[in-house]
Amino acid sequence: MRKAAVIHDLSGFGKCSLTAAIPVLSALGVQCCPVATAVLTGQTGYPCYHCTDLTAMLPDYIDAWGKNNAHFDAIYSGFLTGAEQISQVLDFIRYFREEHTLLLVDPVMGDDGNAYPFFTPGLLNGMKELTLETSIIFPPLYLLLSHQNFYCFP
């Protein structure tokens, strides 16, 4: 069975994040090893949500999984809370990537043509750095990286 580290948030309400990724990948025969970046009451598109950032835990995953000799066929990152998390995801990738490891990034920057309020230029620069390490980039990051005039991003 193939194994994937799935680095994403856990949203209690909304069809997204780990609650969507785990069943889809599992149905495809992939064992999911979740790495929670944050726990949210609901996804960020709702007018009211609360978020607990789990940035401080990410180095613990690298430490514990490294000591347990973990190996992954894929590493997939989704919602990240900021530049520090991006740096830690890069550390995770550099630690666990092997020659065959597929790297996927879904930058989770906004919905319906609107950027999320927390999405800053610093976060964009971190996403650019993260995508240099990846095999597959999900939209809409290609719009920002290509510097095209896209109506929701300056």
Cite the ranges covered by each PLM segment.
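Conserved beta-alpha-beta core of the PfkB/ribokinase-like small-molecule kinase fold
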Residues: 77, 83-154
